[in-house]
Amino acid sequence: MCSRGVGRTTEQGIRIGRAGERERIRGRVRAVIGQLEGILRDLKEVAKELKEVVEQIDRLTSDFEFELDTDDWTPGTVSSTSSSEKGGPLCDLGPLDFLSSDSWEFCSFLEASTPSDSGDGSDRPPDFRLLNGGVTPNGPDSSSEEIPIAQQKPPPSKNSGSRDRVRFSDKVLYHALCCDDSEDPPYGQETPRDPPRATAPCAVMKSKPGGLTGVRKGTRNCSTQTVCDKSTQTVLPYVPKKGKDKL
């Protein structure tokens, strides 16, 4: 019996604890709801104050006239009104109704609408003498103070008939006979050209009783000669030994 009574009391205590927790949660929720209601009331009061401020601004600005004529419109007013109205219809602006402040068409319109500075209205062409670096005026009374143009002197012309003589010296002849590339000939002197080589006659080679074996160009074996010797000496015809004995 005692155990049953103890079990009942514990169950009742648990129920009471759960009920207390629920009451606490409900109290917190009610408090939050009350705070939200207070915030909504404050917002409503702020909205009323804003309406009153707007009405006062309308009363103060009712005496001002903000309507402008079409001639007074500028690109700034056009852009401001278009941004404020968010794409609303604009009034008739004449030639500016299709232009914007950042378009090339507006720039061309301004260039076409600007009047010319000259009184007669005729466009004077630019002075090409100033552009090409000609005589530059130095003020309003600079007719006498003009910068002279530097005249270019023509280069001295040489006579076609006259020709410099080439004087040959021992040094030039030495260079003609011996190749020495370390030293260049002096300025104004020309090295003599190689004399034309004599054409060597063709020697006919005879063979045993059979006839001609072939035609051979007679040249002298000059394997020990230098390049300069070959260029300066004439080529001697080749004569076989039999021919030398007969001579």
UniProtKB/Swiss-Prot annotation:
Family designation: Belongs to the INSYN1 family.
Gene coding for it: insy1
Keyword vocabulary terms for this entry: Coiled coil, Synapse
Places the protein is found: Postsynaptic density
GO biological process, alphabetically ordered: inhibitory postsynaptic potential
InterPro entries xref list: Largen/INSYN1
Species whose genome carries this gene: Xenopus laevis (African clawed frog)
Annotated GO CC locations: postsynaptic density
Primary localization: other
Disordered: annotated span: 69-90, 112-166, 180-217
Protein name: Inhibitory synaptic factor 1
A Pfam family annotated for this UniProt entry: DUF4589
Reported function: May be a component of the protein machinery at the inhibitory synapses, probably acting as a scaffold.
Segments forming a coiled coil: 30-65
Biased composition annotated in UniProt, kind: Polar residues: 76-85
UniProt lineage: Eukaryota, Metazoa, Chordata, Craniata, Vertebrata
